């Protein structure tokens, strides 16, 4: 569906929400790459302001020179503007209100009006729906202005990839890292995907408070490429969790991977 929006070359802002590490940003990047669309990504933080987004004066060789921000660049080039982690923004994001309506923007500091070029549109990603994080999972996210949120016609609720899709993602990562997907590696990928799927189902049922993301699985593959040991890769990438969670996740993995104990030093 996102590809259809981007392929239409219409101005149609899209808000994508979902759990951390489930491929929201990657999906936008892939869609633009497949459609040969230019993508300009802006990582939003609570400190992001008009100067970061729209632009401002910079000191160059002793003179003040206007420098366009990424939003203006996207406007002029008809690119897809990605506001990544937009729910971390403060109310300074409201400088984009007129642009969010598909209109241009008047740069009062230089007295110039910028019109959007054909193909320009906006995609925003967030872990929340712009209403803050009630459970505290995403500390730092903010309640976004309702008028700002209302300027997004549609919202995609992105889930984690299916096991089949996730397996393809890990295979692609293996290819990128020059890891031959031979029999033992192929089994390793299956175990990882099945493991993550079980953890997520348990999370949704309220049985646990943590989750294994697609990004975490990619981290494990990268760790395996560096250290050459599957079990070490799994354990090191679980160290970010508290001891109880780490132990329960590891116990579940060992139940799936029957070779774990005997190959623990391999």
Where are these regions (language model features)?
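C-terminal regulatory/interaction module of P-loop NTP-utilizing enzymes
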Residues: 1-266
């Amino acid at each position: 569906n996102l590809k259809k929006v981007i392929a239409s070359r219409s101005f149609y802002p899209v808000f994508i929400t979902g759990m951390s590490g489930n491929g929201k940003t990657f999906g936008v990047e892939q869609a633009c790459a497949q459609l040969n669309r230019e993508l300009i990504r802006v990582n939003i933080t609570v400190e992001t302001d008009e100067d970061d987004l729209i632009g401002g004066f910079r000191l160059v060789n002793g003179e003040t020179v206007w420098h366009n921000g990424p939003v203006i660049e996207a406007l002029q080039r008809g690119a897809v503007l990605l506001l990544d982690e937009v729910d971390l923004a403060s109310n300074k994001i409201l400088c984009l209100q007129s642009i969010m309506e598909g209109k241009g923007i008047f740069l009062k500091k230089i007295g110039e009006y910028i019109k959007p070029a054909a193909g320009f549109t906006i995609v925003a990603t967030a872990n929340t729906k712009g209403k803050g994080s009630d459970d505290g999972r995403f500390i730092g996210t903010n309640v976004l202005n309702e008028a700002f949120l209302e300027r997004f016609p549609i919202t995609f609720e992105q889930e984690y990839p299916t096991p089949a899709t996730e397996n393809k993602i890990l295979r692609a990562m293996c290819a990128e890292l020059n890891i031959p997907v031979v029999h033992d590696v192929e089994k390793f990928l299956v175990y990882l995907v099945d493991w993550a799927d079980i953890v997520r189902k348990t999370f949704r049922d309220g049985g646990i408070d943590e989750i294994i993301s697609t990004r975490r699985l990619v981290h494990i593959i990268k760790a395996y490429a560096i250290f050459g040991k599957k079990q070490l890769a799994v354990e090191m990438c679980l160290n970010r969790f508290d001891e109880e969670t780490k132990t329960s996740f590891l116990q579940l993995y060992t139940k799936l991977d029957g070779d774990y104990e005997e190959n623990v030093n391999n």
